[in-house]
C-alpha cells in the first residue's frame, strides 16, 4: 500500500508567570522547530525524549511528517531488556494476582500467544462499555466500573496480556485529522510476526453500535478486524504509558486548586504537579511541570497549559479531498438554502452537483463508504432528473 504522509503541528506557549519544564518525545526528523531541547534522552521504547525549559512567553513550535500508520515492522527479536520492559507491572496497567487469574480464566485451554491475546481482546470488547470521559483512569477502576474510554480499554488489554507473558505496549497518539483529536490503542509482540496493532476500544464501538458499520473504513468493517489491523489514519506520539521522565520529575509538596485533579485508580492525581513514581502517566504528546505554590489567586490553568496544542493535516491527494469537502459542503448548503427560498432549476443543479462531488470525496477517502455510497447514488439519480428537466 502506498504511504500517505501527514503533517503534525505542535505548539506550546508559556503564558504563565514562571518557568515551565516540559518533556516531549522528539521525532528523528523535524521539519521546523523554534527551540532546541536542553537535554535529550533515549527511551527504552526507542524514542528520543526531549527536555525543555520554557520561560514566560517562550514558544515551542515544531512540525514533522508521519507516514500512514502501520505496526508491521521487520520481525526483529526483542532484547531481554525490551521484553522485560513490555512485561512490566505499572500503576495504570498492573501485573498481579488479580490480572493473572482473570487472564487465565479468559484463556482456558488456549496455548498460543496469538490466540490468548485474541481471546482477551474479545473478552474486553464484549464485557466493557465505552464512556468518555471516564470516572477514573487505570485498570483498577476500569475493572470496578466496567466502563472507560480508549485509554482504559488499552490499559486493561496491556495488563492482561502482560500477565500471560505477552509483550504489550499502549500507544498514545492522534487521529490523522483535526485538532487535539487524541486516541490510544495497543501493539503486541509475537515472535513470528513482530509488533501487531490491536484497537480494543474501536472494536467495542463497532460491535455495540449496530449502525456503526455505516461509518466504517473498509479495512475494519467487521469489529474483529481491529485485532491485527487498523484503518491507518492515525499518528503515534509515544509507544507506551508511564514513561520515566529524565531529568527526574520533582513532585510538588502541595497541590493547587488551580488545577482540577485527574482520578487515577480512584485517587486524585494532579497533572503537572506530580508523577507516577517518576513517570508521566502518558505522553500525548507532552508532560509539563508547573509550580503552583506561588500562583496569584485568580490564576487559571487550561488544557493548553497542561498539554499544549496539536493538529494533524493530510497532504497529497487525500489532503486535497479533505479541503475540498469543506468548500463543497458550504457551496452545497448555501445553494440548497437559496433554492429553497427561490426555486430555480439552475440552482437546483448546482447544489445537487455539489453534493455529488462532496459525497464522492467521502467515498474516495474511504470515510463512511457505505453510508456515503448510498447518498451518492441517490443524489446522482436526483441530479440526472434535474438535468433532464433542464434539457
Regions found by a protein language model. Give the residues of each.
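A structural boundary/capping signal
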Residues: 159-163, 319, 336-339
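Intrinsically disordered, low-complexity N-terminal segments that are enriched in acidic
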Residues: 1-70
Amino acid at each position: 500500500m502506498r504511504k500517505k504522509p501527514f503533517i503534525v503541528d505542535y505548539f506550546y506557549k508559556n503564558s504563565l508567570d514562571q518557568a515551565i519544564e516540559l518533556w516531549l518525545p522528539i521525532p528523528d526528523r523535524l521539519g521546523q522547530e523554534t527551540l532546541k531541547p536542553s537535554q535529550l534522552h533515549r527511551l527504552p521504547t526507542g524514542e528520543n525524549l526531549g527536555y525543555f525549559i520554557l520561560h514566560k512567553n517562550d514558544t515551542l513550535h515544531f512540525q514533522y511528517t508521519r507516514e500512514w500508520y502501520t505496526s508491521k515492522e521487520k520481525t526483529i527479536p526483542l532484547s531481554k531488556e525490551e521484553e522485560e520492559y513490555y512485561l512490566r507491572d505499572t500503576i495504570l496497567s498492573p501485573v498481579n494476582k488479580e490480572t493473572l487469574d482473570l487472564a487465565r480464566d479468559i484463556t482456558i485451554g488456549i496455548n498460543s500467544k496469538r490466540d490468548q491475546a485474541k481471546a482477551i481482546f474479545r473478552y474486553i470488547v464484549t464485557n466493557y462499555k465505552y464512556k468518555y470521559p471516564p470516572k477514573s483512569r487505570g485498570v483498577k477502576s476500569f475493572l470496578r466500573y466496567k466502563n472507560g474510554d480508549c485509554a482504559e480499554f488499552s490499559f486493561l488489554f496491556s495488563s492482561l496480556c502482560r500477565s500471560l507473558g505477552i509483550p504489550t505496549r499502549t500507544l498514545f497518539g492522534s487521529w490523522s485529522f483535526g485538532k487535539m483529536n487524541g486516541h490510544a490503542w495497543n501493539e503486541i509482540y509475537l515472535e513470528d510476526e513482530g509488533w501487531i496493532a490491536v484497537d480494543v476500544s474501536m472494536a467495542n464501538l463497532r460491535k455495540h453500535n449496530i449502525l456503526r458499520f455505516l461509518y466504517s473504513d473498509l479495512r475494519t468493517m467487521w469489529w474483529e478486524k481491529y485485532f491485527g489491523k487498523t484503518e491507518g489514519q492515525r499518528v503515534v506520539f509515544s509507544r507506551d504509558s508511564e514513561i520515566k521522565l529524565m531529568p527526574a520529575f520533582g513532585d510538588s509538596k502541595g497541590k493547587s486548586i488551580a488545577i482540577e485533579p485527574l482520578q487515577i485508580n480512584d485517587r486524585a492525581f494532579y497533572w503537572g504537579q506530580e508523577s507516577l513514581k517518576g513517570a508521566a502517566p502518558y505522553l500525548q504528546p507532552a508532560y509539563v511541570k508547573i509550580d503552583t505554590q506561588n500562583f496569584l489567586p485568580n490564576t487559571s490553568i487550561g488544557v493548553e497549559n497542561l498539554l499544549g496544542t496539536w493538529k494533524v493535516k493530510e497532504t497529497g491527494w487525500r489532503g486535497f479531498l479533505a479541503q475540498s469537502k469543506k468548500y463543497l459542503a458550504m457551496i452545497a448548503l448555501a445553494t440548497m438554502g437559496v433554492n429553497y427560498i427561490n426555486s430555480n432549476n439552475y440552482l437546483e443543479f448546482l447544489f445537487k452537483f455539489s453534493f455529488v462531488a462532496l459525497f464522492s470525496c467521502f467515498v474516495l477517502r474511504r470515510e463512511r463508504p457505505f453510508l456515503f455510497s448510498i447518498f451518492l447514488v441517490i443524489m446522482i439519480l436526483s441530479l440526472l432528473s434535474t438535468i433532464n428537466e433542464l434539457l
